[in-house]
Amino acid sequence: MTRKQKRLAIIGGGMSFIVAAVLLVMFAFGQSIAYFYMPADLEKTPVNPGTRIRLGGLVAEGSIKRGEGRTVSFTVTDGEAKVPVSYTGILPDLFREGQGVVTEGMFDAATHGFVADSVLAKHDENYMPKEVADRLKDKGLWQQGAEGAAPAASAASGDKTGATK
């Protein structure tokens, strides 16, 4: 091999290595990214079953149903739409109706419901996950109180008017 051929072989090998590394990084990120949706977003842009997402909103009043073992089903709402959620596991201590929640999982094509593998609840009376709070503010379903921020009463009950008292 001449010097020119050696140089081209080294450059070609280096470029191949860089392309392979970039493709591996893109593949790894593609597997771990979970986009955030509110229930109303899912009505506008349906998600393919098996696609991993984060679903946020409020736990609808009267929707928590305990099943066999540690299985719990409940409904997540943003005041406009509702999504049934099924979760098997131990729920956070602060999980309850009318409170903010972010679930992560996938849609099940057979049941047409959301199957969560993790559930996050707000950790005190003044906290709501930023994504959920921003979306509720955009929809007019957020009330700011003297004691701190809280979801509007109509949002937890699924009232579509968004009116606060």
Swiss-Prot record:
Residue ranges, compositional bias (Low complexity)? 145-158
Residues on the membrane's Periplasmic side span: 29-165
Q: Which GO terms describe its molecular function?
A: heme binding; metal ion binding
**Its membrane topology:** Single-pass type II membrane protein
Disordered: annotated span:
138-165
The residue spans the entry assigns to the Cytoplasmic side of the membrane are as follows 1-7
Q: What family is this protein classified in? A: Belongs to the CcmE/CycJ family.
What PANTHER family does this protein's entry cite?
A: CYTOCHROME C-TYPE BIOGENESIS PROTEIN CCME HOMOLOG, MITOCHONDRIAL
| Record-given protein name | Cytochrome c-type biogenesis protein CcmE
Which organism is this protein's natural source?
Agrobacterium fabrum (strain C58 / ATCC 33970)
